[in-house]
Amino acid sequence: LEWAEVKKPYWTPEVILAEDDNKNIIGSLCVLIRKIPIFGNIMYASRGPVCDIHDLGVLEQLTKGAKELAKKYNAIVLRIEPDVESDDQEFRKYVTELGYKIKDDAKDFMDEIQPRYVFRLDISGKTEEEVMAGFHQKWRYNIRLAGRKGVTVKEGTREDLKEFHKIMVETGARDGFIIRPLEYFEKMYDNLAPEHMKLLLAYYEGKPISGVIPIFYGNKTW
């Protein structure tokens, strides 16, 4: 729901719930609705549905709720981006039976605004040394070299978003990708920090030189 607040007012959020026979919530789908000129309304569920993705009954409930929502908003399409492994054949079978079309035609990582795949590093139960040991030798060298040269990393505040955004704008201009306005990152911070978001900045000789915004979702970080 916090993410839905970030997307306002351009997107209208709705939440669909699935319940068991005892009215316990067993699944949810946070849907964002937006009007697209000429085409009409579209519905989008980032990282949804949230449920046992192999429970066909729950998926059916959530899909039924999405269809009712589509009628309410006269939406032409629902796009979901579930957190599942790309080769999960059972899930692919279920969603296909429910009428979804799996988009497999992206040829390149950057073919779409949202990458088709994400790459995940399991660090559960590992020490910092064990995580480092899994890196390529060159990366281990670069990380340690930065430390020896005096590069430090600190957690930033909302005010530090201005410096982070300057770095993003410079990087986007150099590498040819679009950067959201500062206000968007401030809205993210207001709705997600500190529980679901942090700002980390790297400094060299007192000057910020790079930064990252990790987003926490369940037991995972993006």
Residue positions per predicted region:
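Acyl-donor binding region in acyl/amide transferases
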Residues: 39-111, 218-222
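A conserved beta-strand-loop-helix scaffold within acyl/acetyltransferase catalytic domains
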Residues: 1-22, 26-39, 82-87, 98-222
